Regions:
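Sec-dependent signal peptide recognition
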Residues: 1-7
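C-terminal motif of bacterial Sec signal peptides marking the signal peptidase cleavage site
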Residues: 12-13
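A short beta-strand-turn-helix
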Residues: 18-37
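Short pre-active-site segment immediately N-terminal to redox-active cysteine/selenocysteine motifs
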Residues: 35-37, 41-45, 112
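Conserved redox-active cysteine motifs that mediate thiol-disulfide chemistry
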Residues: 41-58
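Thiol-based oxidoreductase modules, predominantly thioredoxin-like and allied folds used
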Residues: 65-80, 92-101
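Short, internal strand/loop/helix patches
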Residues: 84-119
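Thiol-/selenol-based redox modules, centered on thioredoxin-like
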Residues: 118-144
């Protein structure tokens, strides 16, 4: 009985992730407190999305900045394995959500890609529906 009680206490004390990435790892919102999150909705059939990848890879290296992707076709249940394959194909260095972002933030399905949401402390600060340049990304980081 004592073993079961200890096991139960251990299981209840383990922190569960609030969302998952396509690599199987999880995270909590607290992990990104005071960081600027660029949530980039992309697709492999979108040339401007592919052009943005190196820019997002670069800005993701900045302190207090996190880039998180979500493939547009995941709204229709594109498997994580396929998303990971595409991310490798395009040399994407940032993480990609497995959890539908509409369940994490008050987002609507974007009308177009690329769409990038700028989020800080759970609040959506801006929605950008055009391709971003390195200069614009740096400007957005500086202003947020």
């Amino acid at each position: 009985m004592k073993k079961y009680l200890i096991l139960a206490l251990f299981l209840f004390s383990c922190e569960r992730p609030e969302f998952l990435f396509t690599d199987g790892k999880g995270a909590k919102f607290a992990d990104y407190e005071d960081q600027i999150i660029f949530l980039n909705i992309w697709a492999d059939w979108c040339p401007p999305c592919i052009i943005e990848f190196p820019y997002f890879n670069e800005i993701n290296e900045e302190p207090n900045v996190t880039v998180i992707g979500f493939h547009f076709d995941q709204f229709d249940i594109l498997p994580n394995e396929e998303v990971n394959r595409l991310m490798n194909k395009f040399n994407v260095d940032f993480k990609n959500l497995s959890t539908d972002p509409r369940n994490l933030w008050s987002l609507d399905l974007p009308d177009s890609v690329p769409t990038t949401y700028i989020i800080k402390n759970g609040e959506i600060l801006d929605t950008i529906t055009y391709p971003l340049t390195p200069e614009k990304l740096r400007e957005l980081v500086a202003s947020n």
